[in-house]
Curated annotation (Swiss-Prot):
Signal peptide: none annotated. Its EC number is 3.1.-.-. Residues 51-90 are annotated as: Disordered. Belongs to the LAGLIDADG endonuclease family. InterPro entries: Homing_endonucl, LAGLIDADG_dom, LAGLIDADG_Endonuclease. It holds the Pfam family LAGLIDADG_1. This is Probable intron-encoded endonuclease aI3. GO terms for biological process: intron homing. Encoded within intron 3 of COX1. The gene is aI3. Disulfide bonds: none annotated. Gene3D superfamilies: Homing endonucleases (3.10.28.10). It comes from Kluyveromyces lactis (strain ATCC 8585 / CBS 2359 / DSM 70799 / NBRC 1267 / NRRL Y-1140 / WM37).
């Protein structure tokens, strides 16, 4: 009976749908954690209620269990197992021994790919360790990722409609799929995967409105993204009131959207001269978009720290050199931002300017240790985490 319960429980967890409609893998950390807990609980129950079998069944090694679970959530754990042994199905043995053997195989199953466990996104809840994160964490991380690699687009559709959408495109690998799936879980959208890229797209108006509200709470920091956001907010509001006017303004100004003065113009323009659009309350509702190219030094530190994780996923590099002169750098074409980060981390190195890109690179052991401590506390979530672990092992 207990074996049937266990099989049903495992089947339920294995096929429990995640937010993207796919299924959770049996070997991700949370599922692994749940299975071990229930197996351990049932095993102890049987041992306590089958005293005749007590001498034939040793309790689970709790210290081994705890250390393994710490390893499953520990960002420093290594993949050290390659065998492909499966859970044994033993016949002619009592239920307690069956449960013990199943649990023992899971506890000692060296065939579980630890690298996969350490780099898989749990379904729903998170065990202690690298993946301990929640809704606000991923919202802040999303803004950093969007600042570094996102895009806000407006497209004309069938000559009489405008389409609005936000996009993040990352290299196609398991870790980047995981991070975008988590963003989808908290912020909606869709995931498209091809041979080279995994792409998160959101294009329905309701969720775009929610993201605009999110950017009010956790503001974009790069100048270009601020101006892209200002353009979509302006055109979208006008589009709701007068479709033809919005299309005309979009076609006229789409190549001028990075000009901060454009949004003052949208506020001050006499709309009665364009398509005879003059609702009495338009100017009251459309207060204009204020663009501040300077970066607010009063940002919440926790926000900036988590934002930086998202930013580094696309604009950071952990460099390993043969001469052991390793370094960490981040870059962008936004001088205001790079100087803000330079001051934020109190880095004295000079900026490098090359091909219209500002680069801040650190070699000194002092700065290397600062960033190791930082990324140990604030954990990277995508493929950059894999690069960081390799880099960290060489530098400690």
């Amino acid at each position: 009976m207990n074996i049937i319960i266990i099989i049903l429980y495992i089947s339920y967890i294995y096929t429990y749908p995640f937010s993207n409609g796919k299924y959770c893998n049996l070997y991700n950390p949370t599922t692994f954690y749940k299975i071990n807990n229930i197996l351990y609980s049932i095993k102890i129950y049987n041992i306590n209620n089958n005293t005749n079998n007590t001498n034939n069944n040793n309790p689970a090694d709790s210290s081994s269990y705890e250390s393994r679970m710490r390893a499953a959530g520990n960002s420093n754990s290594n993949s050290n197992s390659n065998s492909d042994s499966n859970i044994n199905n033993t016949n002619n043995i009592n239920n307690t021994n069956n449960i013990y053997n199943i649990n023992n195989n899971i506890n000692n199953n060296n065939n579980i790919n630890n690298n996969y466990i350490n780099n898989s996104i749990p379904c729903g809840s998170y065990p202690q360790g690298r993946w301990t994160a929640g809704s606000e964490f991923y919202k802040m991380l999303f803004v950093g990722l969007f600042d570094s690699n996102g895009n806000i687009q407006i497209n004309k559709y069938k000559s009489k409609y405008l389409q609005f959408r936000l996009i993040i495109k990352l290299n196609n690998n398991k870790e980047n799929i995981n991070i975008l799936n988590n963003i989808k879980h908290y912020l909606k959208g869709n995931i498209n995967i091809n041979n080279n890229y995994v792409i998160w797209i959101i294009n329905d108006i309701k969720n775009i409105n929610n993201l605009i509200k999110l950017f009010n709470k956790y503001p974009l920091i790069t100048i270009n993204k601020k101006l892209q956001l200002a353009f979509i907010k302006s055109i979208y509001y006008i589009y709701k009131n007068n479709r033809n006017l919005a299309i005309n303004l979009y076609l006229k100004d789409r190549n001028n959207k990075y000009n901060p003065n454009l949004y003052k113009y949208y506020k001050d323009i006499n709309y009665t001269k364009i398509n005879y659009f003059s609702p009495a309350n338009f100017h009251k509702k459309f207060a204009g978009i204020n663009i501040n190219i300077n970066i607010n030094n009063n940002y919440n530190h926790n926000y900036i720290n988590v934002w930086f994780l998202g930013f580094i996923e696309n604009k950071g590099k952990f460099i390993i050199r043969k001469n052991n002169n390793n370094s960490f750098l981040f870059y962008i074409n936004d001088k205001h931002l790079i100087e803000f980060l330079k001051n934020y981390f109190n880095i004295k190195n000079k900026l490098i300017y090359k091909n219209n890109i500002y680069i801040l690179e650190v070699y000194n052991k002092y700065y290397i240790n600062i960033f190791i401590k930082f990324f140990n506390k604030y954990n990277l979530q995508g493929y950059k985490y894999i690069e960081y672990i390799k880099w960290k092992k060489i530098n400690i």
